[in-house]
Curated annotation (Swiss-Prot):
Places the protein is found: Cytoplasm
Underlying gene: dinB2
Protein name, UniProt field: DNA polymerase IV 2
InterPro entries reported in the protein's UniProt record: DNA/RNA_pol_sf, DNA_pol_Y-fam_lit_finger_sf, DNA_pol_Y-fam_little_finger, DNA_polymerase-Y, DNApol_IV, IMS_HHH_1, Rev_trsase/Diguanyl_cyclase, UmuC
The EC number(s) this enzyme carries: 2.7.7.7
Cofactor note: Binds 2 magnesium ions per subunit.
């Protein structure tokens, strides 16, 4: 049985800003820009109480929270703090799989400290993060990656939650599927239409049913409904692409609706690019039709895509020619590949595509 920890920094970007500027502490803070095209990169817990969250348009966030304070992002600082945190992880285990600047999986079944309890390691790490960075982290401890991820959400912020092998299956059965890692809003809505609202409902469906309705994701849903996840923690995972996709609630037939659906996907991918200091030269558009067949269209440029506006322009070049669409569009996705890193000197604004 493996011992897995999922560490998730609490409102990471916003917490760094509040740490470095005492005047922001205790106030609703959004990292991003307040302009009409701006997007919230991160929100403090004070802002989240008003319904503000990451990837929300700035104008919407300001409407929800008139007292919201916007601060420009400092991704060079966030990356530096992330490196501090990664250094702490490395003192306990070589099996660290970073998911982003602010979260990671650790396999501590065998660890450098010779500690038998993963909970003890998680508490040590949380304490060191607090002492060395003056930030808080939440941790989930369990026997696989899925449950460790679910556990870290249970006591946020600044908490620890453990899911043991004895309690794992019951925990999953009681959990709403919309809270499952890997189940997005569109998938949760589809599950609801199929009468699946809890882990118990999901477990009651056989593998053939889940494969019929969810394709390649079917086996994943089948096993996590039973508290089983065999994925290993993969250290130094080399990312070959950055992508985002979404399923429409109703099939899309017109270009304007497709454009509107593509905008948040472009923003999500660009947000990751800015946060990680990565850029890509090849952009791929994925279109899944109503009959589940799909096509992809790609464009490669000489220099890495340098802005969200440029990314939007390329997306338009790929999207427009498929209209008038021969059939309804079920899903759109956008991916950047041919990746490379950039230095910290140029950080364009996180913004919504025009």
């Amino acid at each position: 049985m493996r011992k897995i920890i999922h560490i998730d920094m609490d409102a990471f970007y916003a917490s760094v800003e509040q740490r470095d500027n005492p005047e922001l502490r205790g106030k609703p803070v959004a990292v991003g820009y307040p302009e009409a095209r701006g997007v919230v990169a991160a929100a403090s817990y004070e802002a989240r109480k008003f319904g503000v969250h990451s990837a929300m348009p700035s104008v919407t966030a300001k409407r929800k929270c008139p007292e919201l304070i916007f601060v420009p992002h400092r991704f060079d600082v966030y990356r530096a703090v992330s490196r501090q945190i990664q250094a702490i992880f490395a003192e306990y285990t070589p099996l660290v799989e970073p998911l982003s600047l602010d979260e990671a999986y650790l396999d501590v079944t065998e660890n450098f400290r010779g500690l038998k309890l993963a909970t003890e390691i998680a508490e040590e790490i949380r304490g060191r993060i607090r002492a060395e960075t003056h930030l808080t982290a939440s941790a989930g401890v369990s026997y696989n990656k899925f449950l460790a991820k679910m556990a870290s959400d249970q006591r946020k912020p600044d908490g620890l939650f453990v899911i043991t092998p004895k309690h794992g299956p019951d925990f999953v059965q009681a959990l709403p599927v919309k809270k499952f890692h890997g189940v997005g809003p569109a998938t949760a809505e589809k599950m609801k239409r199929l009468g699946i609202e809890t882990g118990a409902d999901l477990k009651s469906r056989d593998l053939a049913f889940l494969q019929q309705h969810f394709g390649k994701s079917g086996p994943y849903f089948y096993w996590i409904a039973r508290g089983i996840d065999e994925r290993k923690v993969k250290p130094d995972r080399i990312r070959k692409s950055i992508g985002a996709e979404d399923t429409f609630r109703e099939d899309v037939h017109d270009l304007e609706t497709a454009r509107a659906g593509l905008k948040p996907l472009i923003d999500k991918v660009w947000h990751y690019c800015e946060a990680s200091g990565i850029r890509g030269k090849t952009m791929t558009l994925k279109v899944k039709w109503a009959d589940f067949t799909q096509i992809t269209r790609s464009k490669t440029i000489v220099a890495p895509i340098a802005s969200v506006a440029e990314m939007s322009e390329i997306a338009e070049l790929l999207l427009s020619p498929i209209f008038p669409a021969p059939k309804g569009i079920r899903l759109l996705g956008v991916t950047l590949s041919s990746l490379d890193t950039v230095d910290d000197r140029s950080e364009p604004q996180l913004a919504l595509a025009l």
